[in-house]
Design a protein with these regions (language model features):
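N-terminal membrane-anchoring alpha-helices
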Residues: 1-38
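Short, surface-exposed "cap/lid" segments of acyl-processing enzymes
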Residues: 54-111
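Catalytic nucleophile-loop/oxyanion-hole region of alpha/beta-hydrolase
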Residues: 113-128
Length: 128
């Protein structure tokens, strides 16, 4: 039994280290990002290119003190793989509320949409 366990561990380690890797550009060039003063409109414009977003999973900001009002702390919620902003709600909302912080829900490429949309994205696009 011990030899079987060791064999499985070695096989898994070999797969992990020798398996195929998806080449990806992981550096982000922030100089190309031009966010307008109306953040809600900026996010809505970016999401308008998709007609299959599940309701309430789009990129959005939950403003603590009114639309457009900055706070000293802001939280960014990045959901898990194949999930959406609704993954662990209302936990992020309660943390933001306790801190008096604005809360930004992002939506990774392909997430919060149809099953087919998940196949459209790659690692590099998830970094954008």
């Amino acid at each position: 039994m011990r030899m079987l366990f060791i064999g499985v561990v070695i096989a898994l380690a070999a797969i992990w280290f020798l398996g195929p890797r998806e080449p990806a550009q992981l550096a982000i060039d922030f100089t190309q990002i031009n966010i307008t003063s109306d953040i809600d409109a900026y996010l809505a414009e970016g999401e308008s290119g998709f007609d299959d977003i599940t309701p309430n999973t789009e990129k959005r900001v939950i403003w603590a003190n009114g639309v457009g009002e900055k706070t000293s702390v802001a939280l960014v919620y990045i959901h898990g793989f194949s999930a959406s902003s609704e993954e662990i709600r209302p936990v992020p909302d309660k943390v933001a509320q306790a801190l008096g912080a604005n809360l930004y829900f992002t939506r990774l490429r392909g997430h919060g949409r149809s099953n087919e949309a998940m196949a459209e994205a790659d690692v590099g696009q998830w970094m954008q």
